[in-house]
Amino acid sequence: MIPWLAANDRFPPVERALEEPNGLLAAGADLSLARLIQAYESGIFPWYSEGQPLLWWSPDPRMVLFPSELKIQRSLKKRIGRRDFEVRADTSFEEVISACSEPRSGQEGTWITGDMVAAYAALAGAGHAHSIETWIGGELAGGLYGVALGRMFYGESMFTRAPDASKIALAHLVRQLERWDFGMIDCQMKTAHLARFGAREIARADFMRKLVNLVNYPRSTRKWRLDDDLFD
């Protein structure tokens, strides 16, 4: 059994999360700005589908990417070297999250519900959520979004409309975060795609120890601007 959270209830300790399904911790509450920030500070994220209650997760192990461990495959390096694109930050957050919410091939629905879109748009408006966007020929070709607290970044979702567009965005994000001394990127669940970039699983206890330090750095709420020389 998992607890059902009322509006003012705090999250239970992440150690109480279920083993199956891995990481399910609680249900209920809301997607208010304060609740989402509290969740991320606590190593918890929302994940649910249309028609389900609001579910909160903290899996063990946790997939993370340390910026200094970024791996870029040779083919992507060549693609980046062509410089026939522009990577921007925070110019089209709502377009990025809306694109991420579109059902993927082979999927019937999406976990990025209308309520989630509105909640993360509010986070972006408050300066805590950011989008990284790949533009080709003046069109948004791919990108990703996530949450930043202190020197911790939480990746949420990505999309692509052109070959390698989301990969280009991710590579630029990680290079920039390393330059800004961010310590860790939360990738939540294991995927082969992120593993190719150097992401790996660590124990939830290790994740939480690192998280506590990283989220306590000063928090900027300014819109991001990426450096122009990340791949010079």
Language-model segment annotations:
Residues 1-232:
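N-acyltransferase acceptor-side catalytic subdomain
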